[in-house]
Amino acid sequence: MATNTRAKIIGVGAYVPPKAYTNHDLEEMLNTSDEWIQQRTGIVKRHWVEGTTCTTDLALKAAEEALENSGIAKEELDMIIFATLSPDHDFPGNACFLQVKLDIPGIAAFDIRQQCSGFIYGLSMADSFIRSGQYKNILLVGGEIHSKGLNKTPEGRDIAVLFGDGAGAVVITATENPSESDSQFYSHNLHADGRFAKELWLSAPGTAIAPDHRITSAMLAENLHYPYMNGRTVFMHAVKRMSETLTHTLKSEGKTIDDVDLFLFHQANMRINDKVGEILGIPPEKVFNTIQDYGNTTAATIPMGMRDAVKAGKLEPGMLVGMAAFGSGFTWGSSLIRF
């Protein structure tokens, strides 16, 4: 009989910096209110780093927890995939720096930049590598530090209140000839539409906008080094695209909403997730949200939610899990796995 190689998750981990900032902590700083933030986002608090803590510091903690839960040694890994939009340095990628901190030189290591969709894209890539037979054990990390790049003044409050710092990680391994009830990845669905890239982006620094330097004093004066978001456009597209991609993935596997035990959505805005659930007819108790505790940690939201769901007893082996994300690019995608 031919061997059917699939991928599965065997370990999850997450980490956030110790210092939490509640909405009340931001009221004076940003001239806002707890009520205003909660009504528009569902966020109650977020964690921000202090001092020289960098993204791979957070990622290391998440990776160590995922490895401990996986039951395999770090030396058994043969690839690291790191999804981030906030690397420690412009280059090389964070996967290389994390490799050093884990002390596992020589294995494949690379970054992907798909912003809030990064973890879903990473799942699909890891799945493909494992199904090819070239790799057996892959560490997939989503990690971000947003707090060092936010406009923490009343002018920037619409975006500053949204984002938190954190990291999530999963260890993915090969499994042979799994039965329907065994842990495994089923399918993924990925998309992008670059026509909307400037509706949610960071224009500077970059090689496209300055003749001699990637950033200038004029750019700083115009706040081009802070992220820009067209909130209304992002909301409408996120709801539409997340609903579409999840429907497509379920249909491709002959599954329905009723078959899925738990949904893990990217945590950008509670109103987005509520609307997607309403459109698809998902019972609220099947959706596990963490945005109230962490804010939007972009590529880290889904693996962080996965870890928290396990700890809360909401996610157990054998459960069918549907995931969907939407982010800058625009990029979006979904995955269906049996945990």
Model regions: which residues?
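Buried hydrophobic positions in well-ordered alpha/beta secondary-structure cores of metabolic enzymes
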Residues: I9-G11, I37, A66, L77-I80, ...
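Claisen-condensing/thiolase-fold acyl-transfer catalytic domains that form or cleave C-C bonds
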Residues: A2, T56, L60-A63, L67, ...
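Acidic-glycine-rich active-site phosphate/pyrophosphate-binding loop
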Residues: L30-Q39, H89-D103, L140-G149, D212-L220, ...
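Anion-binding (especially nucleotide phosphate/pyrophosphate-binding) glycine-rich loop
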Residues: N69, A73-P105
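Short beta-strand segments
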Residues: I10-G13, A83, R113, I138-E144, ...
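Short glycine-rich phosphate-binding loop at a beta-alpha junction
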Residues: E75-A83, I257-H266
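Flexible, glycine-rich active-site loops centered on histidine and acidic residues
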Residues: R131-A167
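Condensing-enzyme catalytic core mediating Claisen C-C bond formation in acyl metabolism
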Residues: M1-G51, G156-M236, E244, F339
